[in-house]
């Protein structure tokens, strides 16, 4: 099962129905993506919750003003089709208004961080 797609879909659906929290399976990848979303100001908080032997991440969503459009997440690299980019050709989402989350050899980071460190990687998703 694609945990990244599950995370993105859960957040997207929660925004559609105006839910305040989202619960997803705790994986290191989901935690790192959540950390980036928190750092960039797309979500309010993250916490870990244990239910028996299972661990979950609880994302508290951040809502903007009513008239503004909510955040959009789009999965780019999929299990059946991986999309890679080197740092000079790293895509800019909406001309720099959004972010691309990239999995590199040095961990999961934003496209800006990858360009700054001059490393490429797999483009996981776009957020704007």
From Swiss-Prot:
Tagged with keyword Lipid metabolism: no
Keywords, alphabetical: Chloroplast, Plastid, Ribonucleoprotein, Ribosomal protein, RNA-binding, rRNA-binding
Gene3D superfamilies: 3.30.1370.30, 3.30.1490.10
Cell cycle is among the record's keywords: no
Principal cellular location given in the protein's record: plastid
InterPro entries found in the cross-reference section: Ribosomal_uS8 (IPR000630), Ribosomal_uS8_CS (IPR047863), Ribosomal_uS8_sf (IPR035987)
Cellular compartment(s): Plastid, Chloroplast
Protein family membership: Belongs to the universal ribosomal protein uS8 family.
Record note on quaternary structure: Part of the 30S ribosomal subunit.
HAMAP family in the record: Ribosomal_uS8_B
Full protein name: Small ribosomal subunit protein uS8c
Protein source organism: Welwitschia mirabilis
């Amino acid at each position: 099962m694609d945990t990244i797609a599950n995370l993105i879909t859960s957040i997207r659906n929660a925004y559609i129905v105006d839910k305040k929290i989202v619960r997803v399976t705790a994986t290191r990848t989901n935690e790192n993506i959540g950390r980036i979303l928190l750092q960039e100001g797309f979500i309010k908080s993250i916490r870990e919750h244990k239910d028996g032997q299972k661990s979950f991440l609880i994302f508290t969503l951040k809502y903007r003003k009513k008239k503004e459009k909510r955040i959009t997440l789009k999965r780019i690299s999929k299990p059946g089709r991986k999309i890679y980019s080197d740092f000079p050709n790293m895509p800019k989402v909406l001309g720099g208004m959004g972010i691309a989350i990239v999995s590199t050899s040095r961990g999961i980071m934003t496209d800006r961080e990858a360009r700054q460190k001059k490393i490429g990687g797999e483009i996981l998703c776009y957020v704007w």
